Amino acid sequence: MSGRGKGGKGLGKGGAKRHRRVLRDNIQGITKPAIRRLARRGGVKRISGLIYEETRGVLKVFLENVIRDAVTYTEHAKRKTVTAMDVVYALKRQGRTLYGFGG
């Protein structure tokens, strides 16, 4: 054993990150047709032009909250990989229980 503790094989010494890509404006990757498809699935017939930016904003806030909670669960378990169960628990904590992904 190399003294790295539990689950420490092959993870290196954990030195400084060399490159961290700056992520910005990725919310525009949620395209107008994608939002339209979601609305159609929800039974919407006509969509105002202002809806697309509003939807992106709401989706961004929702995902930030879920991901923050999921990462908190991951860190508490001393893992580096966010699992499906972390996301399920994060959604449950927010009152949006999701079935079909274990647990």
Curated annotation (Swiss-Prot):
InterPro entries: CENP-T/H4_C (IPR035425), Histone-fold (IPR009072), Histone_H4 (IPR001951), Histone_H4_CS (IPR019809), TAF_TATA-bd_Histone-like_dom (IPR004823). Its main location: nucleus. Residues 1-20 are annotated as: Disordered. The modification N6-acetyllysine is found at residue 17. The modification N-acetylserine is found at residue 2. One of its GO terms (cellular component) is nucleosome. SMART domains: H4, TAF. It is found in: Nucleus; Chromosome. Pfam families: CENP-T_C (PF15511). Keywords: Acetylation, Chromosome, DNA-binding, Methylation, Nucleosome core, Nucleus. Residues 1-14 have a biased composition (Gly residues). The modification N6-acetyl-N6-methyllysine is found at residues 6, 13. GO terms for molecular function: DNA binding; protein heterodimerization activity; structural constituent of chromatin. SUPFAM superfamilies: Histone-fold. It comes from the Eukaryota. Residues 17-21 bind DNA. Core component of nucleosome. Nucleosomes wrap and compact DNA into chromatin, limiting DNA accessibility to the cellular machineries which require DNA as a template. Histones thereby play a central role in transcription regulation, DNA repair, DNA replication and chromosomal stability. DNA accessibility is regulated via a complex set of post-translational modifications of histones, also called histone code, and nucleosome remodeling. The nucleosome is a histone octamer containing two molecules each of H2A, H2B, H3 and H4 assembled in one H3-H4 heterotetramer and two H2A-H2B heterodimers. The octamer wraps approximately 147 bp of DNA. Belongs to the histone H4 family. This is Histone H4.
